[in-house]
Every structure is written in structure tokens, then in C-alpha cells.
A protein has these predicted regions:
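Gram-negative outer-membrane beta-barrel proteins
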Residues: 48-54, 74-76, 93-99, 114, ...
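Short loop/turn motifs that connect adjacent beta-strands in outer-membrane beta-barrel proteins
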Residues: 24-37, 73-85, 98, 113-119, ...
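Residues on the lipid-exposed face of transmembrane beta-strands in outer-membrane beta-barrel proteins
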Residues: 42-46, 64-70, 91, 106-110, ...
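Residues that define the transmembrane beta-barrel architecture of outer-membrane proteins
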Residues: 36-38, 58-64, 98-104, 118, ...
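Helix-adjacent hinge/juxtasegments
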Residues: 89-117
Length: 171
């Protein structure tokens, strides 16, 4: 009985160690990520510090949006790791109070493919608001994705001037 238990524990720990080692080493294997040229990301977002805070004092808003990223470099700035670089653009509709504000960001997206299930990214850039309020603002984001498959991922983006959660489709 003890021999069977020991064999099962050994087999389970071997499988877990091999799986964990694969996940750890993926970042060190350039090019080991889904093959795509465009990432389409519909999302919901919470914006804050919106321009045009009038008498209604609404500085935040909630709404739907879309981000599209075109992959520019398959093996990004650091050739020894699994990274890509793209240009991202979007359109977000925020409705703070009784007014509508649209946010149009343009960012550089630097992706780090950590494992077959996880990736992270940073996005510096800028954008402009228009609608009942208008203005120009810097944009800084950091985010992560949980990949259900090579084609679909759950995406979380945190930064300034908004937070977003959505689904990424790698086309």
C-alpha cells in the first residue's frame, strides 16, 4: 500500500514539476506564442479623471470599448525572450452622468509571453477625449491575459486614465 502511494506521489510531483518547468521556460523561448497579426479586444471599462468636469462634478464614467492591436515585431526589443511589439488603437465610450465622452487611445503594446496560459503587457501612449468634454491625455497601462486557447484570452488592463476587462481574439 505504501509503495503504491509513494509511486503515485512521485508520478504526481514529476508531472507538476515538468508542467511548472515548461511554464517558467516559455518566456525564455522567443517565438513560442500564438501566431497572429491582429488582436481584437472588446471590453468594458471604468474611466476616471475625465476632462470637462463641469458643475455636475462627474469625473468618472463606465462604458463599452474596443481596442485593436497590430503586431509590428514578432521578436521584440529583447531577442532572448518571448516578446512581441505592436501598435494599439481604440475607441471607448464613457458615460459620466448625463454626458457622453469618447476616448481614443494610441499606444505601443509590448507583450511578454510568460507561458502557454499567461501573458503580460505594458502600454505607453496618449489619447484624446471628445464629446461633451474634450482634451488630450497621456496613457499608461499594464495588463495581463489568461489564455483559454491560442485564439482567445481574458484580458485585464489597469492604468491611466481607465481600467478595462475584456476578451482578446488573436487573428
Amino acid at each position: 500500500m505504501m509503495r503504491k502511494l509513494a509511486a503515485c506521489l512521485f508520478a504526481a510531483s514529476t508531472v507538476l514539476c515538468v508542467t511548472r518547468a515548461h511554464a517558467v521556460n516559455t518566456i525564455k523561448q522567443p517565438g513560442l506564442h500564438p501566431a497572429y497579426t491582429f488582436e481584437a479586444e472588446p471590453h468594458l471599462l471604468l474611466g476616471f479623471d475625465l476632462p470637462g468636469k463641469g458643475a455636475d462634478k462627474h469625473g468618472s464614467g463606465f462604458g463599452p470599448g474596443f481596442r485593436g492591436t497590430i503586431e509590428l515585431v514578432d521578436n521584440g526589443f529583447v531577442p532572448s525572450i518571448n516578446n512581441t511589439v505592436g501598435i494599439g488603437f481604440g475607441l471607448d465610450w464613457l458615460s459620466p452622468g448625463d454626458r457622453n465622452v469618447f476616448w481614443v487611445p494610441v499606444v505601443m503594446q509590448w507583450n511578454f509571453w510568460l507561458s502557454d496560459r499567461w501573458s503580460a503587457f505594458g502600454e505607453p501612449g496618449a489619447g484624446f477625449y471628445f464629446g461633451k468634454a474634450s482634451g488630450f491625455a497621456p496613457a499608461f497601462y499594464a495588463g495581463g491575459r489568461y489564455h483559454f486557447s491560442d485564439a482567445v484570452a481574458l484580458t485585464l488592463r489597469l492604468g491611466y486614465p481607465n481600467f478595462a476587462i475584456g476578451a482578446s481574439f488573436f487573428l
